[in-house]
Amino acid sequence: MSWRGNCVKIFLENSHDVREGRKDENNMKDEYVAYVGTYTHGSSIGIHLYDVNVEEGTLTERKVIPVNNSSHIARSLNGKYLYSIADEGVAVFAVEDDGDLTPINKVDIDGMRGCYLSVDKTGRYLFVAGYHDGKVTVVHTHKDGRLGSLMDGVFHKGLGSVAERNFRPHVSCVVPTPDNKYVCAVDNGIDQIKMYKLNTQRDRLKLVDILRCERESGPREIVFSESGKYAYVIYELMNKVDVFSYRDTGNGPEFEKLQSISTTSANVDQAHDAASGMCLSPDHHYLFTSTAGDNTVAMFHIDPETGCLEKKFALPISGEYPKDIAMFPDGKHIAVANHESNTITTFTVDYEKNVLVQKGRPMKVETPNCILITKK
């Protein structure tokens, strides 16, 4: 697995579809909702459901669906179901026509509370990342929406830098590669991304390679480009994004490092800042990140030829600890879940002036962990 290589930055003309505000007609005809997962130690009781006004870039709270400590949520591949962390297990809900949620069942994951969910490209398997116990769990899913038995569970081993928090495994993200050939398990504690092969015949995860990150970098999340050729890794402790090329060699995954770029504004305190959220714009022309402490959202233009990033801005978001971010489907607005100020803020993204324009007052919601904006 390679870390060599430099990126030649050839920044092409930005997409007129986004820059000139041209809306996708299909997106504008569809109706959308937002789900916000919260901790339930205080007054919140679960997943907050919002109606989304795409044109205005606003959210209107409708109701709260009870579920304990919804630290992360994910939609099924066919869109019919919503998965949520639920204490030491995972709950699944049927998504009704109006976006409301009806409980189906819940399974225990034989470990501590998870922090991240994703599904494979067939929709047959649900992946759970375990931050507290350093575990990767795979759960069978059924066609009727029910969660089935645990397929496999792997505990990471090893030590990090043996300094404060990152001294043992903390799996913070588990996602399949775009070709569905491998499973990437990002370990925030031991500064590694472990690559597994999913053996569906034996119901086992097999470790095939390890991407070793910088010591004390704290990799938090990985996302892939629409083409599947590039991967973006955000680092919680170094407040940066690394760009990698990705391909399957036939003998295993190959990642080649192309670029590193900061997520923060000019005046930062590395000791108290923590890069946290990351998402792509709907047209995949831009990458957005959020950084706690600095309390900013950054926007990067993605070069379509090289996958490399050009930072356009890193601006304050009128909240504390922007733990997660989500783009509206028109690409013109962004929502920020501010975990410690107990708010959600929404902004219009001005691609011409490279600024964020806040939409109204922050909305109160206790300890928001994650936000998902999706079609009803």
List each language-model region with its residue ranges.
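Loop-centered beta-sheet repeat module
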Residues: C184-N239
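Short loop/turn segments immediately following beta-strands, especially the blade-tip
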Residues: D51-E56, F93-G99, V139-G148, K197-D203, ...
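Blade-loop segments of beta-propeller domains
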Residues: E61-G123
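Short loop/turn segments immediately following the C-termini of beta-strands
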Residues: Y39, D87, Y131, T141, ...
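A short beta-strand motif characteristic of beta-propeller blades
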Residues: T60-I65, T102-D108, G158-E164, K206-R212, ...
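Asp-box/WD-like beta-propeller blade repeats and closely related beta-sheet repeat scaffolds
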Residues: P103-S172
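Beta-rich, blade/repeat-based domains predominating
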Residues: S43, V67-L77, D110-K121, K157-P178, ...
